[in-house]
C-alpha cells in the first residue's frame, strides 16, 4: 500500500507526538474551560504504540491499509527526560489517533507502560487535578523542546501521560471514538473509578455486574463491566479475578468499526493476525487482532458504551 505521508518538518512532527504533547486549539481551550476537566478532545488523546524494533513501517502500513488515514514523517528524537532515542510518528486514522515509537535504545522506565497520551488544556492544572484525584505522579513534569509532559498512575496501576505544547495542532474529529480498555481486580476497582472519574470529569454510563464472560474469551462465566464516558472519550473497565485467556488484558484500546467482518478481512490482508473471535454478544461483536510489530487491539461492531 502507498503510504500517505504528511510532509512536516521535524519541529512539526514533534508537535504531533503525543508522548511529548501539543497545546490546545483556542476553540478547544474555550470548550474545555466550561467543564471541570482539562480534556481537549478525543482526537488529541492518542494510544501509545511501542513496536518491536524495526517494525514501525510494517505496523503503520498495516494499520492504514485496514482503517485508512494518514501519518506524519518519521522523526528520530528523544522523548523522555533521560537520554534515549526513538524513531516516532503520529498516525491519524478515522478510528483513533496513535503515537508510534520504535526505540533505538532501551526504553527508560516507566515509559512503555503508559497506555495513552492526554492533551491538557492547561498542563499545570492537569497535574494538580491528577494529584487531587488520587493519582500518583510517577514521572514528574519535565520540559521538552516544545512543551511539557508528566506520567500519572491511577489506582490499580493504570498509567497515562499528560502533555501540553506551546504550538497547537488541529486534527479533524474522529469518525468513531475508541475506548480505553482497563482491566482491574475487585480490590482496586472502587478506588480507580473514584479517582479516574474525578480527573476525567466522566460519568458511569453502565455497570453490569453479570456481563457475558464470552466477551473476554470466558463463555459461561460472568464479570463486572463498567462503561464510562468523559470528554477524553470512552473507557471500558473489566473487573475480573485475573484468570484471563490470552490475549485479553494485553490490549489497551478498543476500536469501533462499522463492519467487523470486512475490517478483519482487510486486517489479515494487510499482515495482521486475528488472535480471537469474532464473538457475537449482547448487541455487539468483537475480536482481538495483533498488527505487525506486536500491537494488540480490540475491534468491535455495535453498542460498546
Predicted regions and their residues:
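C-terminal functional regions that serve as terminal interaction/effector modules
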Residues: 235, 252-260, 265-268, 273-280, ...
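Core segments of cupin and vicinal oxygen chelate
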Residues: 38-41, 48-96, 140-154, 182-233, ...
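A cross-kingdom feature marking solvent-exposed beta-strand/loop segments within repeated
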Residues: 74-78, 82-87, 99-127, 131-149, ...
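N-terminal low-complexity, Pro/Thr/Ser-rich intrinsically disordered segments
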Residues: 29-43
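Short beta->alpha transition motifs characteristic of CBS
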Residues: 143, 163-169, 299-305
Amino acid at each position: 500500500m502507498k503510504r500517505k505521508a504528511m510532509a512536516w518538518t521535524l519541529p512539526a512532527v514533534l508537535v504531533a507526538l503525543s508522548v511529548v504533547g501539543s497545546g490546545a486549539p483556542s476553540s478547544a481551550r474555550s470548550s474545555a474551560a466550561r467543564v471541570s476537566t482539562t480534556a481537549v478532545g478525543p482526537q488529541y488523546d492518542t494510544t501509545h504504540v511501542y513496536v518491536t524494533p524495526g517494525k514501525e513501517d510494517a505496523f503503520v502500513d498495516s494499520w492504514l491499509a485496514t482503517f485508512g488515514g494518514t501519518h506524519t514523517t518519521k522523526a528520530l528524537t528523544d522523548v523522555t527526560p533521560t537520554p534515549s532515542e526513538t524513531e516516532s510518528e503520529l498516525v491519524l486514522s478515522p478510528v483513533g489517533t496513535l503515537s508510534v515509537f520504535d526505540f533505538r535504545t532501551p526504553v527508560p522506565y516507566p515509559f512503555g507502560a503508559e497506555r495513552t497520551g492526554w492533551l491538557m488544556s492547561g498542563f499545570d492544572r492537569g497535574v494538580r487535578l491528577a494529584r487531587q484525584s488520587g493519582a500518583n505522579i510517577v514521572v514528574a513534569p519535565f520540559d521538552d523542546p516544545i512543551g511539557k509532559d508528566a506520567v500519572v498512575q491511577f489506582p490499580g496501576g493504570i498509567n497515562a501521560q499528560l502533555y501540553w505544547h506551546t504550538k497547537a495542532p488541529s486534527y479533524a474529529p474522529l469518525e468513531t471514538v475508541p475506548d480505553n480498555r482497563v482491566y482491574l481486580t475487585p480490590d482496586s476497582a472502587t478506588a480507580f473509578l473514584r479517582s479516574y472519574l474525578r480527573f476525567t470529569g466522566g460519568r458511569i454510563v453502565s455497570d453490569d455486574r453479570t456481563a457475558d464472560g464470552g466477551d473476554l474469551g470466558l463463555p459461561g462465566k460472568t464479570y463486572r463491566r463498567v462503561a464510562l464516558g468523559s470528554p477524553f472519550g470512552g473507557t471500558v473497565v473489566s473487573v475480573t479475578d485475573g484468570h484471563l485467556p490470552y490475549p485479553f488484558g494485553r490490549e489497551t484500546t478498543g476500536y469501533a468499526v462499522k463492519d467487523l467482518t470486512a475490517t478483519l478481512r482487510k486486517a489479515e490482508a494487510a499482515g495482521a493476525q486475528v488472535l480471537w473471535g469474532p464473538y457475537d454478544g449482547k448487541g455487539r461483536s468483537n475480536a482481538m487482532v495483533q498488527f505487525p510489530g506486536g500491537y494488540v487491539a480490540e475491534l468491535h461492531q455495535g453498542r460498546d458504551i
